[in-house]
Each structure stands twice: as C-alpha cells, then as structure tokens.
C-alpha cells in the first residue's frame, strides 16, 4: 500500500474447493492468513488470477467464478473492505451484463478518494451479438461498498486472454493492454483517464505482430509522478523479445523501445519503479532451466544490472511472477512447482 506495507494473496485448492486468502508482512514475518472467499465452482487459472488491492481506505479482492457450463463462462466476483467499518462486503459481480461469457484479466488501482478503478476483459459481445463480436476492454470505478460509480467500454476489440495493467501517473490513471486489429495484429495499446474521459487508445509502439491466436502474455505498466514504464513481450517473426518504453509526460508519449531480452525468454513480465527512479522489469529466462530475472534501468533507459532471482519452470503451472517496490527494495513472488506447489517470496535490495 502507499505506506510501504506488503500484502500477499494466493489461492489454495483441494478436492472440494478453492480458497482465496491473504497475509501482511510484518517485522516478525507474515501475519496469520485471512480468508477472503472460498467456493466450489471457481475458475482457477495460471494466467488469469485474483488481485488484491490495498490502500489506507481499505481493500478490494476479486476471484473468478463459473457462471455456466461453458469452459470459459466465468464472471468476476469481488469483495470490498472499508477500513473505517472493518468489514468485508458480501461478494458481488462487478460487471452488470448478466451474460455467461469470459470475464477476467483484472487490474486494480486505488484512487485518492477511496474508490478503486478496476479494468477487465469482457466477453459479452462474443456470445451476445450476431455475428459474434470480439473481446472488449471495460473499466469501472467502485466505492468501498462495492457500488459501481461509473463504467466505460474502453476498446471494442482486444486480445482475448492477455493481462491488463494499470498505474497512477501525476496526470491520472493509465491502462495498458494487448489490442487486436481486424488483421490480427496484437500490439500493446494504452488509454488514459483525463478530465473524466478516456483518451482514444494508442499503440505504445508498432511492433506489427500478427498472430492468429492469443499469446497469453500481457503488458505491465508502472508509474511515478510523470514517469511511466511499460514492458511487454512480442514474438514477431518467431523471435521472442521483451521490450521496455519510458515516458516523461504521464504516458502521453513514449521513447523508442529498449530490448530487455531476446530471444531467450517466454515473457511473463512485470514492472515497478524504485524510490531512486530506477525501473525494474521482471521476466522469464528460458536458457536451460527457466529462471526468474530482474533487469534494472535508470531513468534514461540505461541498463544498470541484471539479477537472477530463482529457478523456475517454463510450464504454465509456474504462473506469472509479480513484483512490488518498497523504497529501493523489490519483493518478488512466484509459484514454485517443485514437489508440492508453494508460493515463495524474495526481497532484493538495490
């Protein structure tokens, strides 16, 4: 949260049900786990996973729950926790379409008035329209009671199963995601909330990656004041590549891309910014056994260091590593699938 406290959420499963829980890191270690929700009909997925958003006014957490018998008929369920009431709301569905279709790939961003900006991929048009439409990107602002303050469709045609990502700039929120053109070009786009309206989505760089299916590899954005960093994966011409662009004007314009790694990667990126202004990009190295890597850049995009965090696996079960900065330290969390799967956390001090 904004005070520098670290919270970790995870999903555990047994034969009967799935459980979403969280814990807070204290000076003595992790405090007791607290259960947010549990259920027997959840959609638990390696790439589309729950998010916990925390600030001084409270918390928001979501999970995915099956809504019909189709493989990808699932909805986004959420609970909201108001700090002043010290209670969680009843679970609610954050989208109001009532259509059994794919809804997921959520990102959350606390706003300074105690509300939360939630963005998600929404498949209502894929089953509701004739002929079937495409996956859409939607966003809404929710208060701590779970009420929907406002909602928008941000893009009418996006990649079906790549994560969305959001960050707060000095000039307001920015959301990045993988677009999908009529010609099946799936490049990374951004839209910003300016004076109550969302800007026309723009490509952060024209990779012109034409691919007939979803690569399941979303972008990641981090921001500090007017500085914005976006990292993403593409494999145009079958050459895997992670790139990074920087902005000094809250995402209005971006630098030319910096190649973080190519070709020994399968993506799965995340980004964060240290108090020093250094930018950290996490990514997967696929040379030999897979490894979780951190690359550190200065504000001008110069590479300062590359750190191997841990061995991993290229399999889907290992999921997507997540990073968060506190001061000039980075916390990394990932799923270790050796023997019994478990969630691990490491701290790297810079």
Please give the residue ranges for each predicted region:
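Extracellular, repeat-based ectodomains that mediate carbohydrate processing or recognition
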Residues: 1-350
């Amino acid at each position: 949260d904004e005070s520098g406290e670290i919270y970790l959420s995870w999903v555990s499963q047994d034969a009967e049900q799935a459980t979403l829980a969280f814990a807070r890191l204290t000076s003595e270690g992790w405090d007791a786990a607290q259960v947010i929700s549990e259920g027997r009909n959840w959609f638990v997925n390696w790439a589309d996973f729950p998010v916990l958003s925390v600030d001084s006014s409270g918390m928001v957490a979501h999970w995915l729950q099956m809504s019909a018998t189709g493989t990808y008929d699932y909805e986004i369920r959420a609970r909201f926790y108001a700090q002043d009431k010290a209670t969680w709301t009843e679970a609610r569905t954050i989208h109001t379409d009532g259509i059994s279709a794919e809804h997921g790939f959520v990102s959350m961003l606390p706003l300074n008035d105690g509300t939360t900006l939630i963005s998600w991929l929404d498949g209502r048009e894929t089953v509701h329209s004739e002929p079937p439409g495409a996956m859409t990107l939607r966003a809404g602002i929710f208060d701590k009671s779970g009420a929907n303050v406002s909602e928008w469709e941000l893009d009418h045609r996006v990649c079906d199963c790549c994560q969305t990502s959001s960050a707060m700039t000095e000039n307001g929120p920015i959301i990045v995601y993988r677009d999908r053109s009529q010609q099946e070009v799936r490049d990374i786009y951004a839209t910003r909330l300016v004076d109550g309206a969302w800007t026309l989505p723009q490509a952060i760089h024209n990779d012109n990656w034409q691919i007939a299916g979803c690569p399941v590899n979303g972008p990641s954005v981090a921001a500090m004041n007017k500085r914005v960093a976006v990292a993403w994966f593409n494999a145009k011409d079958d050459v895997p590549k992670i790139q990074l662009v920087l902005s000094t004007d809250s995402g209005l314009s971006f630098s030319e891309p910096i190649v973080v790694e190519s070709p020994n990667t399968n993506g799965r990126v995340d980004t964060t910014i240290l108090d020093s202004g250094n930018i950290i990009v996490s990514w997967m190295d696929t040379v030999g056994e897979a490894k979780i890597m951190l690359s550190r850049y200065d504000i001008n995009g110069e590479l300062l260091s590359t750190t191997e965090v841990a061995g991993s696996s290229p399999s889907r079960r290992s999921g997507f590593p997540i990073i968060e900065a506190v001061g000039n330290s980075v916390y990394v969390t990932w799923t270790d699938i050796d023997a019994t799967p478990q969630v691990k956390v490491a701290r790297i001090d810079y």
